[in-house]
Design a protein with these regions (language model features):
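Functional cores of ribonucleases/endoribonucleases
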Residues: 11-14, 18-26, 32, 113-166
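Catalytic nucleophile-His microenvironment captured as a short glycine-rich beta-strand/loop
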Residues: 54-60, 156-161
Length: 166
């Protein structure tokens, strides 16, 4: 319990805008700790800590991530070319993007725009933790998309959070 008290004391000394590296202790429990292992979180948007009564995860204060240096993002162009603009997916996204002035030929531009904004916003702590899947933590980032009439549309986008800023 002494080490747990130290962990909680260290945690309580953090400010909401501090960044931490989450380190999970290997275990056989069916918990989310492993999915956060090695991930960077801003304190105000990090998972509940401790995760459970037997949690031995540690938080280490780190410097704020720097885009393209200590943090990276990836958005496969196929998210647009083969999903959003595909005729086989009738989910309304294609017509929405087309109404905003985008077409399949803009897939690379959209991918770059999403990556750039997601990375900048993640590193600024401007994201929301949305839970986990079977393998990793999930976050939501609002992408501000310029549209053909000159206005901006804000779109919720989902991202997987991987260890060490990926």
């Amino acid at each position: 319990t002494e080490s747990l008290e130290k962990l909680l004391c260290d945690f309580l000394s953090l400010n909401e805008n501090d960044w931490v590296l989450w380190t999970a202790q290997p275990n056989d429990w069916n918990d989310d700790c492993d999915k956060f292992n090695g991930c960077f979180f801003v304190v105000k948007n990090m998972p509940r800590y401790p995760q459970h009564a037997n949690c031995r995860c540690t938080l280490k204060k780190i410097n704020q991530p720097v885009p393209y240096v200590t943090a990276n993002a990836d958005c496969d162009i196929r998210k647009f070319s083969e999903y959003i603009f595909a005729d086989t997916h009738n989910n309304g996204k294609k017509s929405l993007f087309e109404n905003w002035g985008y077409a399949k030929k803009d897939s690379e531009l959209l991918s770059q725009l999403f990556v750039s904004q997601a990375l900048q916003k993640y590193c600024a702590g401007d994201y929301q933790l949305k839970g986990t899947n079977d393998f990793c933590a999930k976050i939501e980032i609002i992408i501000d998309l310029p549209v053909k009439n000159g206005s901006i549309r804000s779109i919720k986008s989902g991202w997987k959070l991987y260890p060490y800023g990926k």
